[in-house]
């Protein structure tokens, strides 16, 4: 099993008031559905620290799937929905190796909103 990951991070420093809610709404109403069942993607998580950063963490089936997505996304990153909501392009688009994933006793809980 491959651990081909990608992190995309936006800064929320100086972002408009209400950006955290707008991002959570966008994920719940649009982005979650886009990535659910996506070929080549094992899973994606969306993470945020209010006033600091918002990011997507992706794990792909292999490096080829990650590289293809990364190339496609990087070309339009400045105009991506997250960039439009935040008002700036990502500050980081970085591949990584996911060393391991553990499923807890209560199982994974895929949800459009936590």
List each language-model region with its residue ranges.
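Short S/T/G/P-rich N-terminal loop/turn motif that feeds into the first structured element of a domain
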Residues: 1-53, 63-72, 87-114
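A common structural junction motif
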Residues: 76-84
